[in-house]
């Protein structure tokens, strides 16, 4: 905001530097310094914000170093102080910023639409990811009904985030699309309605081409086609009207070299004999004292000419204006107390003007003091008023006003135009302000930058309503298409990711079920799988015949609900006397650890039964439930 405000008020840079000079006595481009500082602070803050967004994008936790914290405080502190000063002592700058929107609002609209389209890319990514997260959570929710309420709360929060991000963006975008309906710009009009180019009054001559209020400056203004010449008039102690703007001689003369103790005195307290000896041009050649930062470099001839300038009298200016037939308008500075012309300074100036024999209609009489006397002595003068009501102007028979542009545009410009009152505004140096005055049908402007404004043949930022409507609709349609395309692209990409996730989840579930079944199958191996070739069933197959009738220990038969009582029909086996055989292995679940390969032996099952001699092996028809 500060940077925007300072850029748009570039027309006031000289006045800002001049006010600081009055307080400090030191000339410096403070306005450019503040502009540079605001630009650096804005760039630093923007880069820091961009870096933070990129880190958040990558999922990296933010950590602000102490140096950055200090710098941020240093950014905020001067901005707050400067904004307070502007709001307290320089409220007119806000008026300038408002006027700039009358010119730049159509272009701000087009740029804002483009920026919103660019910003929609991350917004679309975020909204699409939230949608994918919602769907994935819903998919998971079907597998866990116990947590349904909690999941619903999470989904509601995700939907809320979507609305919180997407809805404001859409509202802002729609507002920008409809913004031209509320835009008023004087430079959007038909070509046939455009008024003539305002005439130019050289403010103190041409202060960008020569030392202000010197004959060189006025001659430069005439060379660049000035319609009139503007100046400020003081009266010396010996009654000679001379040209000087400031209320002391420090800035534009060498008074500090001649009489340092008199540097702060009012110029009207000096005699003309002394004032005529002062140099009024050497300061202009010094680089550190140039009044405008954007001045063109002077040629050697102009530098030499500027060094020899002195304070001119009002009679000198009237002679030039009479010769070139240029209008003259001036501010008349009243003498200080105890001055000989304290109450008659207006009559003295009128007598000097009449003595110059200049055509009276070339004088734009601006001072309001003793206007009745002026009308009686010089009826041909064109009286100029200030920013007062139309009724007051009509009562005083005034048809011209000279006003500050910052106060004119917000205060009834149409009323003055309707009353056929000619308007001169001051001081306009920027092309965009001159274009605004041109499109507003202002009659004349007072300017320091006559070299640039005299070259303009057409107002900047001018366009017809049909052309602007075409650009408006074209940009809106293209931006909507881009936004829809971006949203569809990210939506489709997140949908593909969601389908891949569902597919992988299904495969994972199927695979996990298969693994569980396989684990269960391994845990319940049938008898023939885990049976060792040294078991009874392997050695005596007859014992395992008729599986339906003889359910073994490892035969997985469904247990009957009713238990069959076990009959003691098995004859106990008795070992034979001479029947000594190696122990027969039987199947158990505990495996012995296999010996090392160096022993070259194999793992064997533990045996628990001794060698038995069986005459007639029989199996009872017993059905034992599986434990």
Curated annotation (Swiss-Prot):
Single Gene Ontology MF annotation: glycerophosphodiester phosphodiesterase activity
Pfam family, one: GDPD
Keyword annotations from UniProtKB, A to Z: Glycoprotein, Hydrolase, Membrane, Metal-binding, Transmembrane, Transmembrane helix
GO biological process: lipid metabolic process
Positions annotated to bind a divalent metal cation: 230, 232, 245
Cytoplasmic-side positions: 1-17, 61-69, 129-162, 490-627
Gene Ontology CC annotations of this record: membrane
Topology Extracellular: residue spans: 39, 91-107, 184-468
Residue ranges constituting the GP-PDE domain according to the UniProt record: 198-457
Glycosylation, residue list: 308, 397
Compartments reported by the entry: Membrane
Membrane-spanning segments: 18-38, 40-60, 70-90, 108-128, 163-183, 469-489
The enzyme's E.C. designation: 3.1.-.-
UniProt similarity note: Belongs to the glycerophosphoryl diester phosphodiesterase family.
Protein name in the entry: Glycerophosphodiester phosphodiesterase domain-containing protein 4
Upper classification of the organism: Eukaryota, Metazoa, Chordata, Craniata, Vertebrata
């Amino acid at each position: 905001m500060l940077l925007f405000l300072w850029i748009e008020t570039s027309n006031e840079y000289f006045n800002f530097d001049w006010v600081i000079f009055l307080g400090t006595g030191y000339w410096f481009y403070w306005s450019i310094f503040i502009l540079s500082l605001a630009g650096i602070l804005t760039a630093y803050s923007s880069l820091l914000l961009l870096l933070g967004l990129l880190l958040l994008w990558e999922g990296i936790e933010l950590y602000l170093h102490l140096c950055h914290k200090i710098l941020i405080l240093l950014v905020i502190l001067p901005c707050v102080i400067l904004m307070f000063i502007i709001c307290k002592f320089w409220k007119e700058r806000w008026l300038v910023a408002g006027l700039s929107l009358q010119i730049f609002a159509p272009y701000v609209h087009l740029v804002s639409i483009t920026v919103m389209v660019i910003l929609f890319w991350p917004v679309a990514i975020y909204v699409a990811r939230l949608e994918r997260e919602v769907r994935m959570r819903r998919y998971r929710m079907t597998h866990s009904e116990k947590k349904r309420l909690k999941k619903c709360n999470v989904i509601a929060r995700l939907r809320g985030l979507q609305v919180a991000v997407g809805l404001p963006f859409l509202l802002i975008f729609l507002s920008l699309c409809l913004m031209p309906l509320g835009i008023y710009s004087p430079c959007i009009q038909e070509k046939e309605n455009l008024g003539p180019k305002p005439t130019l009054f050289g403010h103190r001559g041409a202060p960008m081409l020569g030392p202000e209020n010197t004959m060189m400056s006025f001659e430069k203004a005439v060379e660049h086609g000035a319609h009139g010449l503007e100046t400020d008039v003081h009266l010396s102690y010996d009654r000679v009207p001379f040209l000087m703007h400031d209320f002391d001689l420090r800035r534009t003369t060498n008074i500090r070299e001649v009489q340092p103790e008199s540097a702060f005195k009012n110029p009207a307290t000096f005699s003309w004999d002394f004032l005529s000896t002062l140099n009024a041009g050497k300061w202009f050649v010094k680089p550190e004292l140039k009044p405008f930062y954007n001045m063109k470099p002077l040629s050697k001839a102009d530098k030499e000419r500027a060094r020899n300038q002195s304070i001119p009298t009002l009679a000198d200016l009237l002679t030039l204006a009479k010769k070139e037939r240029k209008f003259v308008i001036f501010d008349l500075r009243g003498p200080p107390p105890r001055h000989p012309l304290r109450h008659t300074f207006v009559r003295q100036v009128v007598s000097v003007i009449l003595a110059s024999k200049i055509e009276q209609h070339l004088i734009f009489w601006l001072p309001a003091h003793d206007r009745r006397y002026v009308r009686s002595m010089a009826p041909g003068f064109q009286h100029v008023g200030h920013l007062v009501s139309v009724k007051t102007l009509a009562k005083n028979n005034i048809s011209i006003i000279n006003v500050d542009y910052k106060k004119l545009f917000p205060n009834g410009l149409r009323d003055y135009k309707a009353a056929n009152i000619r308007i001169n505004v001051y001081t306009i140096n920027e092309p965009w302000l001159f274009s605004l005055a041109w499109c507003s049908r202002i009659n004349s402007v007072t300017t320091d930058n006559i070299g640039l404004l005299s070259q303009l043949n057409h107002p900047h930022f001018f366009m017809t309503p049909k052309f602007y409507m075409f650009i408006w609709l074209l940009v809106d349609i293209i931006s909507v298409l881009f936004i829809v395309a971006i949203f569809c692209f990210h939506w489709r990409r997140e949908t593909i990711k969601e389908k891949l996730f569902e597919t992988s989840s299904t495969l994972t579930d199927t695979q996990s079920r298969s693994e569980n079944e396989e684990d269960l199958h391994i845990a319940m191996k049938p008898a023939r799988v885990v049976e060792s070739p040294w078991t009874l069933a392997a050695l005596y197959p007859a014992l395992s015949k008729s599986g339906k009738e003889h359910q073994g220990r490892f035969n997985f038969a469904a247990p009957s609900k009713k238990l069959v009582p076990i009959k003691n029909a098995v004859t106990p086996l008795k070992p034979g006397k001479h029947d000594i055989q190696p122990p027969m292995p039987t199947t158990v679940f505990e495996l012995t650890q296999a010996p090392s390969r160096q022993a070259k032996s194999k793992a064997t099952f533990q045996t628990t039964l001794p060698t038995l001699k069986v005459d007639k092996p029989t199996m009872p028809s017993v059905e034992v439930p599986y434990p």
